[in-house]
């Protein structure tokens, strides 16, 4: 089995630390997706880079094993919701066209915000970390969790969360009502 080595770093830092255009782009993405640290963004960029490198390797190969690996890569990215085309219709060029925003859209934090369970991406992050969000019966506390197509419909408030109650003040605000209006209706 061998000796365990240091775990591989999951992200690569930019080659140059002070490129104004890149810094502005990163700031825009961090604000849009509610990221706390650039390391989170770099982790997703590195993952995307690895998928693209894999696609380039598979483009050059023509053996039957490469075809099986292509299908597995297409299936994986389709199941994660990153590729829009079905695995049978997808091409390696589709993988090469992916952007980091395609990956960021699949984060649990982003999906909670897009489904209207939170008013802002940062509130979505807080709800995830504070155990208010569940996927099916399973509470997930990792905002960067990549939600698959299957799981996307199951994202909701945790059954153990006080937010599950329709009359909770945060849910009333998300609907555009004040908690007082809801109480007055009853």
UniProtKB/Swiss-Prot annotation:
The keyword rRNA-binding applies. InterPro entries: Ribosomal_uS4, Ribosomal_uS4_arc, Ribosomal_uS4_CS, Ribosomal_uS4_euk/arc, Ribosomal_uS4_N, S4_RNA-bd, S4_RNA-bd_sf. CDD domains: S4. SMART domains: Ribosomal_S4, S4. PANTHER family: 30S 40S RIBOSOMAL PROTEIN, 40S RIBOSOMAL PROTEIN S9. One of the primary rRNA binding proteins, it binds directly to 16S rRNA where it nucleates assembly of the body of the 30S subunit. This is Small ribosomal subunit protein uS4.
């Amino acid at each position: 089995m061998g000796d365990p080595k240091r775990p591989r770093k999951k992200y690569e830092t930019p080659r140059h630390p002070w490129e104004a255009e890149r810094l502005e782009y990163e700031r825009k993405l961090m604000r849009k997706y509610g990221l706390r640290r650039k390391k989170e963004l770099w982790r997703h960029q590195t993952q995307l880079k690895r998928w693209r490198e894999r696609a380039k390797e598979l483009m050059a190969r023509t053996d039957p094993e490469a075809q099986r690996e292509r299908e597995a890569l297409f299936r994986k990215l389709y199941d994660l919701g990153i590729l829009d085309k079905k695995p049978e219709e997808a091409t390696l060029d589709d993988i090469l066209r992916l952007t980091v925003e395609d990956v960021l859209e699949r984060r649990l934090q982003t999906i909670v915000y897009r489904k209207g369970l939170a008013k802002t991406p940062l509130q979505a992050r807080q709800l995830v970390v504070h155990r208010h969000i569940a996927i099916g019966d399973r509470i997930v506390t990792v905002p960067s969790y990549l939600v698959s197509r299957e799981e996307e419909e199951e994202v909701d408030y945790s059954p153990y969360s006080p937010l599950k109650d329709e009359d909770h003040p945060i849910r009333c605000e998300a609907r555009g009502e004040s908690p007082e209006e809801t109480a007055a209706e009853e």
